[in-house]
A protein has these predicted regions:
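Active-site-proximal mixed secondary-structure blocks
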Residues: 7-49, 53-182
């Protein structure tokens, strides 16, 4: 890590939080969507996710994110197994959510186009999103591709039609949790 990057990381005001005290906030926010940010080989991307959960496994705090195999985010996570979860606490920008939830990061810089501001994370190499200050920094400790054929038929029909990709589950150990403050 370069000196300038170290100074930027320290300059950003962050209030450390206990992730368990915000688990309900994060779970409720998933209903409308939260951002998952990834970065690899100099490319940053954020996407809106509505599926995930937070808890403990293997004596570690974990956020599990589900990403379709067709997504650009999956490519980035497979190259750099770190991500941030960025949760709105005072509402959300519908334009940013619409863009990041429907456009492909292979084709455009969604973060820039959505007018979002990235800030260096404390531990992982993936940035956080300033406008969505409740942040979890995660390192993938386990990854598994779903086999939709093992799901009940009603779920298969609703979520996995013939032309729809399956999901990869990324179990990210929560290595830092904080609120970004101005």
């Amino acid at each position: 890590m370069r000196l300038g990057e170290t100074m930027r990381r320290k300059a950003m005001n962050r209030k450390k939080i206990d992730y368990t005290e915000y688990a309900n906030v994060i779970t409720k926010a998933l209903e409308k969507g939260i951002f998952l940010t990834s970065k690899a080989e100099g490319n940053e991307n954020c996407m809106v996710i509505g599926w995930g959960h937070i808890g403990r496994i293997w004596e570690k705090p974990v956020f599990v994110a589900y990403v379709r195999t067709s997504r650009y985010t999956r490519e980035l996570l497979d190259k750099n197994p770190e991500f941030t979860v960025n949760v709105p606490v005072n509402g959300f920008d519908k334009k940013a959510f619409a863009l990041c939830g429907t456009k492909n990061g292979r084709d455009m810089d969604k973060i820039r186009e959505a007018g979002l501001t990235t800030v260096p994370s404390e531990i992982v190499s993936v940035p956080a999103i300033k406008e969505y200050p409740l942040t979890l920094e995660c390192r993938v400790i386990y990854r598994e591709e779903q086999d939709a054929s093992k799901l009940p038929s009603d779920i298969q029909k609703k979520f996995y039609s013939i032309d729809t990709a399956e999901h990869v589950s990324y179990y990210g150990e929560i290595v830092a949790a904080y609120m970004i403050e101005d």
